[in-house]
Amino acid sequence: MANMELIKELREKTGASISYCKEALEATQGDIEKAIEYLRKKGLAQAEKKVGRETRQGIIHSYIHLGGRIGVMIELNCETDFVARTEDFKKLANELCLQIAFDSPKYISRDDVPQEIIEKEKEIIREQLKDMNKPPQVIEKIIEGKLEDFYKRVCLLELPYIRDDKRKVIDIIKDAIAKLGENITIKRFIRFEVGEKE
């Protein structure tokens, strides 16, 4: 039986329900760190199930940075207006705006990158590798690796999270899905910077 103090501590750290905290502590013999990991795995598994669900509610959130020199707007969607009004959802929208202001991504995910941009990037990489005397299959592997790096620079969901670079932006969205119990999607975003060329 999990001790109430441990349940309270785990609940404060994770925001999980009492029954989930109790289950996690019993499954990990009262080890708080393992219980947190247990809940994250369970939450992410639940989040994966919610990913395909339709999102028609949400908010438009804006953020102004550096004394008005950088501005970001995002449309963040969820399944119900109840979740859209929660502080956790609004905080996620703000975190995503901060990330966009900081990293200037061009696309939400790799699926949004136009094929002609991918081909252009491959051409640039091939040009950089043309003097290497490597077999074509090795060159293709190098191109794949460099394309992965490209996606990590230009796709919001693949960027390292600004508050914890061991995690990606997609991870904080999955955490929010697990916590709020609804699918969450980024519909679109735009970043403005004073003096920026279009």
What are these model-derived regions, one by one?
Residues A2-E198:
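N-terminal assembly/interaction segments in proteins that build large macromolecular machines
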